[in-house]
Regions:
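Residues within well-ordered alpha-helices
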Residues: 121-127
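Extracytoplasmic/secreted proteins, especially bacterial periplasmic and envelope-associated proteins
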Residues: 75-78, 123
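Concave beta-strand-loop units of leucine-rich repeat
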Residues: 1-9, 16-30, 36-75, 84, ...
Length: 156
């Protein structure tokens, strides 16, 4: 837990074995996050950061709390779309977002080869909560200030 450290930048020269990581409040870029080896729970509530993309490399992450974080809607959308487009080897995750992603919660348009390509954050949320193979080990849960989206298996 580095919340009380007042860290404005974190530099890691090699992977750091860590199951839980907290950096609440303050302002700090997240470019160190891919070097947190084995992290499955991260609390970044009230953090100010320009991008969430480094978190997309944390494929073992199962809980991410961004409650009241100062993160733009565009940065949240970019992160959610990256989760979908780079999904291979990723665990399901319980995400708490600071803002409602852009767009409409609906299946995205398919490309020429039939793959869904999300254009907005809520289209990415739809895919994360509807793709059966991505929810086999556990359900994706995405909480926004207005609504909670979760995978629900199809009933026979």
């Amino acid at each position: 837990d580095l919340s009380a450290s007042g860290a404005r930048r974190i530099r890691l020269s090699e992977p750091l074995r860590c199951e839980r990581f907290s950096l609440c409040g303050g302002s700090c870029p997240l470019d160190f996050a891919p070097l947190l080896d084995g992290v499955f729970r991260m609390d970044l509530s009230r953090l100010n950061s320009g991008t969430l993309l480094p978190l997309a490399e944390c494929r073992q992450l199962m809980t991410l709390d961004l409650t009241d974080a100062d993160i733009s809607r565009a940065a949240v959308d970019e992160y959610l779309i990256r989760l979908v487009t780079h999904h291979y080897g990723r665990r399901n995750c319980d995400l708490t977002l600071p803002v409602v992603p852009s767009g409409t919660y609906a299946e995205p348009v398919r490309d020429a080869v039939g793959a869904c390509v999300p254009a907005t954050g809520l289209e990415a949320v739809w895919l994360l909560t509807h793709e059966e193979s991505w929810n086999e080990g556990g359900a994706w849960v995405i909480r926004t200030p207005e609504k909670c989206y979760r995978y629900t298996p199809n009933q026979p």
